[in-house]
């Protein structure tokens, strides 16, 4: 079980992440609104601007203040560390 830091000390299990997307498009905003009404939205931005939306295999949506590229690099970096050890 590999935990990935998504900002401000918040962690997500990397194997549970299905997608990391940018929140800027209208369909994603509707998707977030629907998740909020279903109580499946987790806001880990601490009041900062949402820069990445993480979709988990459980159907939950996690908002992060980090860029999608940063989170993806942390996941990739973690995989490389596991391979080398």
Curated annotation (Swiss-Prot):
It comes from the Bacteria. InterPro entries: RemA-like (IPR007169). Belongs to the RemA family. HAMAP family: RemA (MF_01503). This is Putative regulatory protein Dtur_1444. It comes from Dictyoglomus turgidum (strain DSM 6724 / Z-1310).
